[in-house]
Amino acid sequence: MFIEGRFYNARMKSPAVESLTGVFDYGHGISAVDSVYDREMQTAIHLLIEEGRAAVIDTGTSHAAPRVLAALAAKGVAPERVDYVILTHVHLDHAGGAGQLMAHFPNARLTVHPRGARHVIDPGRLLAATVAIYGEAETRRVYGKILPVPAHRVIETPEGATLRLAGRELLFLDAPGHARHHVVIRDAKSGHVFAGDTFGLSYRELDQDGRQFSFPTTSPSQFDPAALHHSIDRMLSLGPEAIYATHFGRLTNLAVLAADLHRLIIAHAELGERHRGAGARRKRLLTEGVSELVLAERERQKWRFPREKVLEVFALDIELNAQGLESWLDSEGK
């Protein structure tokens, strides 16, 4: 079940030059549009522009479409000059707005991992599963109207696939660990990598004196610690100076962040193993354990925010990570 959502609010400061409200320019024709997914600077939609042609990397929810259109217009890119809508994976905070945006971009093709293609062509299963958890009204409030993408406009991007944006080569690499339908994209011109959720969560409001952090997301239902370790190492082996995370934006000092991710993935897996046989108490123990990992990271990173604020920022991530550990333990037992 490919579901992910975040429902809390906070205020954050910009990690880059804010050229338009909620749009952050990183150079190399790369920028981030804040989708304002129930809070500022929590979920990014990345734009890649080359010679007046554009690719949109992840879409946010349907509510974010006007923000993307406004950002493109401000950069002088007409809707018919958008060549690609690129999905790192099909969790709804990354792909829920795909159908809406494709309706605005008459010449665009949508790219997606082969395992995710059927879910953008017919999002009924995704939608039904989300409604079953949140209810119809809350699903509509958070995600808006989820539209299908016509099959003839969908390109599957398996391991090693390449596309060109006005001659600028994009390389797609299979990146399981967070989800089996996940890709990361290397931009040949900048040498940078678009990581989706594979390089974790990194919220700018918690940056300490400009020092970034990264915390893994193990949300259900396809967390695979061994695969995630491998995907992180593979991204670093490409030698990027920067990685772009959907949650949120440009990350540097990558070796340090990767070491933190590896350490925390191990800690999550150990937490799961410790409570594997806890029965009805397992969900509560996992949730408490993830909370403890977050608070330990607060001490390690020397975040100035009080414990209550840090737990508020990570509230749904704690819940999702605990759910993902449960799914992982259940799947390992089959």
Feature locations, PLM:
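N-terminal amphipathic/basic-hydrophobic helices that include classical n-h-c signal peptides
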Residues: 1-11
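Metallo-beta-lactamase
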Residues: 15, 61-63, 120-174, 180-244, 248-252
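Conserved beta-strand hairpin/beta-sheet module of binuclear metal-dependent hydrolase folds
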Residues: 16-75, 185-197, 201
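Residue-level marker for buried hydrophobic side chains located in beta-strands
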Residues: 55-57, 86, 110, 192-194, ...
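Active-site metal-binding motif and surrounding structural segment of the metallo-beta-lactamase
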Residues: 66-112
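Active-site/pore-lining binding-face segments in mid-to-C-terminal subdomains
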Residues: 226, 231-290
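C-terminal regulatory/interaction regions
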Residues: 270-334
